[in-house]
Amino acid sequence: MAPNLRKSHPLLKMVNNSLIDLPAPSNISAWWNFGSLLGICLLTQILTGLLLAMHYTADTTLAFSSVAHTCRNVQYGWLIRNLHANGASFFFICIYLHIGRGFYYGSYLYKETWNTGVILLLTLMATAFVGYVLPWGQMSFWGATVITNLFSAIPYIGQTLVEWAWGGFSVDNPTLTRFFALHFLLPFMIAGLTLIHLTFLHESGSNNPLGIVSNCDKIPFHPYFTLKDILGFMLLLLPLTTLALFSPNLLGDPENFTPANPLVTPPHIKPEWYFLFAYAILRSIPNKLGGVLALAASVLVLFLAPFLHKAKQRAMTFRPISQLLFWILVANLFILTWVGSQPVEHPFIIIGQLASLTYFTILLILFPITGALENKMLNY
């Protein structure tokens, strides 16, 4: 009998073991779709980004007009740009839901997979930040100025570090060119990290909604989950296309329709919606260095998740108190996102401070205590 090429060819064998004959738990729900959706987001962003880069000029005098030119004169340039800009939003929606799923079902106990995932999140945030600067509108310029300036809070080396990052004494042409280079490079780094992420995942196999070992009940990835993933792709690409075609500027800032002007500061400097929760945490601390540390901690706290797991059960499926805490945390993140979009005045300042305190209290204190408490409850 001739050998099956799919199982014997050195390259096809890898594809087969990752996407076709991969044993997957039979009961994984739609919450397990977001990994493949993130893959589709990445592919879409790289493809549209490549097409945009062909028409973009990374120069302060030309950047804004080159983007306008792409939208006006390039065939379907407006569509490519709208898909790329809104694709970023969908990328973040998917990654936040993916992380939420991991948190709820205790997937973070696969430490290597979880840690590479957090590194992926940080890389994605860096990519989105440098990408937002490229159209060189008002919010691009001032966002870049405000966020890069945060590095100056680092004691002793801060100021030198910022000037080194800027390539001068303010955000200017050298900053724009290097941000374009970084924005081109980082997505490929994300793709590489994704392969590492998957390699670690396939070492252990997927978790499942019950949080128990499922080796006795596995099904092949193809056709079951390939089909389920295709449904997911359709449900992702449909709203993305709808948003890009019907209301492409819904999530953008009107300030970015004005070319960058270092002499005029916009009334409210705020990042895109997906950074607002972290921005609110940054603003809630009246000290510059303290704010920067809180901002870093808001994402880096995810690295601690495996060490803060005190429950005997892995998933929150049968842990109602932890579930309640989890959904309070989700609501709290929505509050932080809303506060981040508001001006710095009463009552938003105090709301932001309370929400920031709640965020860290739930993650660092209440989750471990609740886990231990639920262990006690198992005895009764």
Curated annotation (Swiss-Prot):
Keywords: Electron transport, Heme, Iron, Membrane, Metal-binding, Mitochondrion, Mitochondrion inner membrane, Respiratory chain, Transmembrane, Transmembrane helix, Transport, Ubiquinone. GO terms for cellular component: mitochondrial inner membrane; respiratory chain complex III. The keyword Membrane applies. PROSITE patterns: CYTB_CTER (PS51003), CYTB_NTER (PS51002). It is found in: Mitochondrion inner membrane. It is a multi-pass membrane protein. The chain crosses the membrane at residues 34-54, 78-99, 114-134, 179-199, 227-247, 289-309, 321-341, 348-368. The cytochrome bc1 complex contains 11 subunits: 3 respiratory subunits (MT-CYB, CYC1 and UQCRFS1), 2 core proteins (UQCRC1 and UQCRC2) and 6 low-molecular weight proteins (UQCRH/QCR6, UQCRB/QCR7, UQCRQ/QCR8, UQCR10/QCR9, UQCR11/QCR10 and a cleavage product of UQCRFS1). This cytochrome bc1 complex then forms a dimer. This is Cytochrome b. The gene is MT-CYB.
